[in-house]
Amino acid sequence: TLQVALDFLELSRALGAAREAWKGGATWIEAGTPLLKSEGLEAIRALRREFPKAYLIADTKTLDAGRTEFEAAAKAGANCATVCLTDSDSTVLECVEAGKNYGIDVCVDLLGLKGDRLIEVARQCEAWGAHHVSLHLPIDDQMRGLDATAQIQALRPHVTIPIAVAGGLNSETAPLAVKAGATIVIVGGAITKSADAAA
């Protein structure tokens, strides 16, 4: 599954990029964190009005008040929202509970986790009822030439839920992520900043 991340500050630019991506066949559209911080949940409402059949992801990166944030995202029209794992399991559990109550999928962002801890946490998230987990390669790691392939390969045998991968993916690296076991490939700038996003 291709997920197009709209990491813009202006809703008008995000909608323009979403239109092009939709024309190109992308059906999973993400209101990125910068867009949500700039425009709020109006970004989700606007995307839902324009793309009623899209699978909309609100990249809320929730850290606290999980039930409240997921309820708000669901009521705005999101199909899925994201939660970042912290030292407290309660936030993820509240998001999962809200997901059941409001019909919104939960993606747990595993940013920063590695090795055995990554596997342990991903398995726990699956047991709690998360829809999928996301391996997010930070920009700083990308600048050092790192990629998420090894993490995907290490994690895939241990969970049955989808694994999403994000961070610097393009037409050359996305197939490698899929080959490694990623189910959802999240691409932002390589699509939204291209001359022909529909292609």
Protein language model annotation of sequence segments:
Residues 37-61, 94-111, 144-171, 199:
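Alpha-helix-loop-beta-strand connector modules within alpha/beta enzyme cores
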Residues 22, 74, 126, 178-179:
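Non-catalytic positions within long, well-ordered alpha-helices that form the structural scaffold/packing
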Residues 77-78, 180-182:
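As written
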Residues 1-6, 29-31, 56-60, 81-83, ...:
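Hydrophobic faces of well-ordered beta-strands that scaffold small-molecule active sites
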Residues 1-67, 124-128, 199:
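Conserved N-terminal beta1-alpha1 strand-loop-helix module at the mouth
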Residues 8-13, 33-38, 62-65, 87-90, ...:
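Short, small-residue-enriched loops and turns at beta-alpha junctions
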Residues 95, 178-179, 190-199:
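C-terminal helical cap(s) of enzyme catalytic domains, especially alpha/beta-barrels
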Residues 65-153, 157-158:
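Conserved anion-binding
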